C-alpha cells in the first residue's frame, strides 16, 4: 500500500478527506448540449474541455515551427520534463497508487506526487480511482474510457463529456481507503491546481530562460505546451491503441493488447494484455528484455532502499495462463 493509515492523523489536512469524498460526485453536474452515450444515455458535452484541448493542440502544432530556432539544451530539458512527468503517472499513479504493486517510502512518494503534478492528468486520487474502475469494469459503461465506444472516445473523447452514470455509481463502491490514508495523496489533491501551474507550466518555462538564456516564448511553447501535449497523447494511446492493436498472448478473451510501439513512448506501459491479466505485477510486463524504463526506475529505487515489496507474477503462473487463455502468439 502507498502509505500507512496511521499517518492520517499526524498532519493538519484531515479535511482533505472530505474534499476527496465530495470529489466523487464532482463529475455528475454540468449543462450544455447533450450527445448520445453508451446504450442511449445522453451525456453532456463539456465545452470548456473541448475548447481548451483544441487550443492546446493548436499550440502544439505551432510549437513545431519553433524547434529549429530553439537551443539544444531546451529540447533536452523538454524531454527530461516529459520523462519526469511520465514517471509520475507510470511509477506513481499507476503502479504504486492504483495497483499497490510495490511499496514506496515517503521521500519517493513525495517525488512521484510532484512529478505527477507535472503530468497534469488529474490528481493521484481521481486518476487511481478511475483506473481501478477501468480494470474492474473494463470495456463496460462503468469504464471511464471504454474502448468499445471507439478509438476517439477511448483516446480523448471521454474527456469531452460528463462521466457515464455507471462510472459514477460504480466508482463510489470502489475501496479507496488506502488512498484516503496516504497524506501525500491528500495534500497533492488539496493543492493540485497550484502544483500543476508550477510544475507543468512555470518551472518548465523558467528553467531554460533563466539558466541558459532561451527565450520565454520558445521555453513556454516547447518545454510546456508541446511537451505536455505529446505526454497526454502518449498516455491516451494506452487507453486506445493498446486496447485495439497487437496480439493477446496471455488472454485472448479480453481486448487489451501487447503494443511495443505504445510501450516505447509510454516508458513501458504498452504491454497491456499482460497488465490486464496480471494487474498486480509491478513490472506490467513479462520477464525478459522488454523495453520498460518504469520497471528499471522502480528497481533502482529498491536498490536505493526507497521502494520495497515488489509484487511479481511467477514464471509458472504466466506459462500456465498463456497455455490456458492465450492466443498462441508467444
Swiss-Prot record:
Cofactor: Fe(2+)
This protein's name: Stearoyl-CoA desaturase 5
Lineage: Eukaryota, Metazoa, Chordata, Craniata, Vertebrata
Keywords carried by this UniProt record: Deafness, Endoplasmic reticulum, Fatty acid biosynthesis, Fatty acid metabolism, Iron, Lipid biosynthesis, Lipid metabolism, Membrane, Metal-binding, Non-syndromic deafness, Oxidoreductase, Transmembrane, Transmembrane helix
Chain span(s) of sequence motif Histidine box-2: 131-135
Superkingdom as given in the UniProt entry: Eukaryota
Family annotation (PANTHER family): ACYL-COA DESATURASE, STEAROYL-COA DESATURASE 5
Other facts noted in the record for this chain: This protein has no ortholog in rodents.
Motif range (Histidine box-1): 94-99
Record note on domains: The histidine box domains are involved in binding the catalytic metal ions.
Entry's localization field: Endoplasmic reticulum membrane
Membrane topology qualifier: Multi-pass membrane protein
Organism: Homo sapiens (Human)
